[in-house]
Each structure stands twice: as structure tokens, then as C-alpha cells.
Amino acid sequence: WTEANRPKLDWQTKIFYSGSACMYPEYNQTDPDNPDCREESAYPAAPDSEYGWEKLFSERLYLAYNRNHGIPVRIARYHNIFGPEGTWDGGREKAPAAICRKVAAVPPSGGSIEVWGDGLQTRSFLYIDECIEATRRLMESDFKGPVNIGSEEMVSINELVDTAAKVSH
């Protein structure tokens, strides 16, 4: 995006930014009994990684562009989207794919898998079709400001492992 493009835009132009729940403060993401990831809970800012900081800073840049130039901006904060064609391995996969891959590798006679942390961490998971529908609705709306796109249901990593194990063998 450059200022040179600005004169070419018409009144229907909107800018979309794909954010992430990783921009929420680490303390909001680690308490399984109180996973506070409401849009307004982003501050005071304290993401747990450079990726989270990049997502937060980028949101601020797009919102500043909106304020300064009047072009509508829509920001989606995605939460663990999964579905077909998602990355399955290699370290970039989401938790559902990583857990399913690990569970599928356990022989029917039994075994264990590595779970980072204590497994009590909770996450919001959303199927890709629901994600696409939510994104479409966001783009068609007049809503201003970042919007979470994820499920309201929080699932612990241990629950995800148990579910994957039940359906795999």
C-alpha cells in the first residue's frame, strides 16, 4: 500500500487487516480460569512474542491511517482457525493439527504425546468456513475497531488431546 494508490480509490474501498489473538497480553492468555481476550483487554499491551507485538503495532498503524485519511479499515483478530488444507506439520501448524498429528502417530497399543505446558491452557478454535463467514460479515459491516473472530467456547489443550484420542483409534 502506498499513498500513490490513494487517488485511484473510490468511496467503496475498505482496507482489511488480518490480526491475531496473539496480540493480547500474555497474562490474558495463560490463566485457564480467566481467559480474558475481549477486544478492550488488549491494553496495557504485553504480548508474549515479537509476532504478537507486530500484530498489535500493525493494527495501530492501520487505525492511524483510517483516522488520517478516512479510508475504512476492518481488523479481524483471528483465534486458532482450523480446517482442510491447513498446515499439518513443520512447526507452523495450529494446535488442532499438531495434536491430531501427534495422536495419530501413537500406536493402537498405547503411548503418550508431548504437550507443551501443563495442558490446562485454553484456546478458542474456529472452523475455516465459520471464519470466512465472519470475515465477510465484518467487511460488509460499518463496525470500526478490531473484532475477535473465534469461538466463545474455550477448550483446554488436554481436552483437545482427549477428543483427538477418542476419534483416532
PLM region spans:
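Glycine-rich "substrate-gating" loop/helix at the edge of Rossmann-like oxidoreductase active sites
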Residues: 47-51, 79-93, 117-129, 151-155
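C-terminal substrate-binding subdomain of Rossmann-fold SDR/epimerase-dehydratase oxidoreductases
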Residues: 105-169
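Active-site loop of short-chain dehydrogenase/reductase
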Residues: 6-15, 70-72, 110-112, 118, ...
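Short glycine-/acidic-enriched loop or helix-start segments at secondary-structure transitions
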Residues: 26-28, 85, 158-160
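Conserved short acidic donor-positioning loop in nucleotide-sugar-dependent glycosyltransferases
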Residues: 21, 99, 152
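Proline-centered turn/helix-capping motifs that create local helix->coil transitions or kinks
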Residues: 16, 22-32, 70, 104-111, ...
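Conserved Rossmann-fold NAD(P)-dependent oxidoreductase catalytic core, especially the SDR/UDP-sugar
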Residues: 1-49, 74
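Active-site Tyr-X1-5-Lys
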Residues: 3-5, 26, 46-79, 98-109
